[in-house]
Amino acid sequence: MGQGPSGGLNRQGDRKPDGGDKKEKKFEPAAPPARVGRKQRKQKGPEAAARLPTVTPSTKCKLRLLKLERIKDYLLMEEEFVANQERLKPQEEKAEEDRSKVDDLRGTPMSVGNLEELIDENHAIVSSSVGPEYYVGILSFVDKDQLEPGCSILMHNKVLSVVGILQDEVDPMVSVMKVEKAPLESYADIGGLEAQIQEIKEAVELPLTHPELYEDIGIKPPKGVILYGEPGTGKTLLAKAVANSTSATFLRVVGSELIQKYLGDGPKLVRELFRVADDLSPSIVFIDEIDAVGTKRYDAHSGGEREIQRTMLELLNQLDGFDSRGDVKVILATNRIESLDPALLRPGRIDRKIEFPLPDIKTRRRIFQIHTSKMTLSEDVNLEEFVMTKDEFSGADIKAICTEAGLLALRERRMKVTHPDFKKAKEKVMFKKKEGVPEGLYM
């Protein structure tokens, strides 16, 4: 139907030859059937020829390639390290030279020992810090006039020869006792206590500033004073005011600091304290809470009690020994004077005993004025109500009332302190004072 006589196409797409032109053809294998579901790769002529053949097994080849890459990285790292060493070599040589200069300046280390006995000008017996004693030589450049038994010396680290004398240094505990910065409190910050201020000025301050007045009148100024009274009456405050008003060296120590753990350390600390005070004279030694070491002597049953008594005996010796104290004044403070040893309070050691009573009405008013001078008070505050009260107030109690009133105002976000704040503060302070420590709290 509708087809011409020329014939159709064969399986390969070639036109079939006409029936009349029949010739014999060579055998050709049939083309493989096309794979279903897989796309054939297109072969590119020149690129396919240049591509390397597939090598098997591929896993071992990849591992070897990875190993070679790691070896290459290590070789590059080594090369970089060698280059850095060559570059840093001049800097290391300079650092080594600087270290050698520092070592030369520092010198060889020396050990510290004690001189036990001088044999002659060139030999001595010394003891090291380890313990043994040695017969050693004394080098020619050592100042032999300063050599005396018991002094500290410097010894060569290897041959233990005496190469120098170690000057006595201040005990670190004593250096801490020195007040470097004068306290801010002055006599104007003390409410009342006019008589006490006058007495301490005559006994402590005036002999240091104008000693010629005592020479003209023919008397020796007092060696020391003791301040005693109830807690919070201004004993330590007055001592701070003395330190503020005078230019003398002020050494402050608490009595409990003189009690040391090891035998003999307490008396040694007392001697060192007064030696430093003598070197830095004119000076004032203030020992607070003297009742810690100055209690009455009795038969001690333990080593600690005997050590406290030895410390007090050394204190008595320093106050009234053969060596004159000169420009060194002593101020003691305690609130238990009845427990002190009578030998400590006798004239010649402590010449003036200054009592600090509870403040009277005039003193209360002055103390309230001092502590409220920088406070912002409302108009309804009446301080006379607290001044005229019958409760026994100390100066510390009045300060606590003013501070507590300010805290109550801050709690309510107010910038002014009102009269009810002072009333609540007074009730709180007096309640705590009367209540005291609950019985059995520390049992």
From Swiss-Prot:
A cellular component annotation (GO) from this entry: plasma membrane
Family: Belongs to the AAA ATPase family.
Originating gene: RPT2A
Region (Disordered): 1-55, 87-108
Annotated localization: Cytoplasm, P-body; Nucleus
Name used for this protein in its record: 26S proteasome regulatory subunit 4 homolog A
Basic and acidic residues bias (residue ranges): 12-28, 87-106
Pfam families membership: AAA, AAA_lid_3, Prot_ATP_ID_OB_C
Keyword Hydrolase: no
GO molecular function annotations of the record: ATP binding; ATP hydrolysis activity
Originating species: Arabidopsis thaliana (Mouse-ear cress)
Record-listed ATP binding positions: G229, E230, P231, G232, T233, G234, K235, T236
Alphabetized UniProt keyword annotations: ATP-binding, Cytoplasm, Immunity, Innate immunity, Isopeptide bond, Nucleotide-binding, Nucleus, Proteasome, Stress response, Ubl conjugation
Cross-link (Glycyl lysine isopeptide (Lys-Gly) (interchain with G-Cter in ubiquitin)): K296, K433
